[in-house]
Amino acid sequence: MTIPYLRPLVCACALAAASSAGAADPVADFYRGKSVTLYVGFPPGGGYDLYARVFAPHFTRHIPGNPPIVIKSMLGGSGAKAAGYMSTITPQDGTSLGMFLDAMTLGKVLGGPGEFDPVKLVWIGRIVSTATVSVVWHTSPVQTIEEAKQRQILMAGTVASNTSNFIPAALNDLIGTKIRVIMGYRGSPDQALAMMRGEVNSIGGMSWEAIQTNHQDWLSESKIKVFYAQGAHRIADLPDTPALLDFAVDERSRQILGLLGSGPDIGRSVVAEPGIPAERAAALRRAFAATMADPAFVEEIRHRHLGLEPLSGEEVQHLVAASVATPAHLVEEARRYIAPRETLK
């Protein structure tokens, strides 16, 4: 993924510099001599873990007091268990951070497990959006959403609770597409093989980064077309590819699709415990902004061919609050799309 133009974070960085220049800094006094734990809701070796390990050593340099950051994997609900742990067990003093599944807030809104309130978590900032797309094979008789309203397309999916299933279900209901999802594929490699063999015409959801890294021939030889982006808004790398809000036909569909597509906008974000002192929350957000603009961090991201599309903690907090504020009757409508459908035999 290319690195889009980094939005200026000058004010935040200036504030951070001013803070560190002061003779007495209670935040630095608190963190000095302590360590911070960054809980990752996935096992080591995956994308979230990689971003956490790239981010942490740079972030620690910008936190007042420079506390070392220890990364711990806490599995369970792709972060829901860790978010609950941070909300009920940890001291809630700013020494515990988390990096969880982008759709964790969506899952909670739809009634998923976890002893946490997404709005009460303190969102520190987003490193990058999660660019997930649906793709169609070049031989598919259906190549666009408009064509999918006229003719059935077979799409590979995984499980009912995955976006590869419930987003097509929502599109079928809200705008009249004829997407038939075949669930039961175990992951992206199985889905890719099924599409190339002609078992299905398309894949419900794949990481755009993974396509660029693992399937360069698909792009160079025009073997696929990106059907749509799974997020509410378009992907910077794919400005001509429609996203979910582009398909909205009225206020009802706009709110439902906005909720279902909220995960990619929240992306790979860093959160802190609810209830931490305001001055520490502000300091962590300033440190995050400074990290995103740090040339050493930007260069490492570039060297590792990772994406960088930062968003401030305040902006992520607003996105989360907007999802949670979705009217209850529309949440109920969205929930019914997450149900078992046709399964691979």
Please tell me what each predicted stretch does.
Residues 99-100, 158, 184-186, 204-206, ...:
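Short beta-strand and adjacent tight-turn residues that come in two discontinuous sequence segments
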Residues 102-112, 165, 169-174, 197, ...:
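A ligand-binding cleft/hinge motif common to bilobed small-molecule-binding domains
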Residues 30-34, 220-223, 249, 265, ...:
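An extracytoplasmic/periplasmic, membrane-proximal ligand-sensing/linker region
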Residues 1-10:
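Bacterial N-terminal signal peptides that target proteins for export
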Residues 37-52, 75-78, 156-163:
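Extracytoplasmic "Venus flytrap"
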Residues 25, 36, 61-69, 85-96, ...:
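Hinge/capping helix and adjacent helix->loop/strand transition within the periplasmic-binding protein
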Residues 119-127, 178-184, 214-263, 312, ...:
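Short beta-strand->loop
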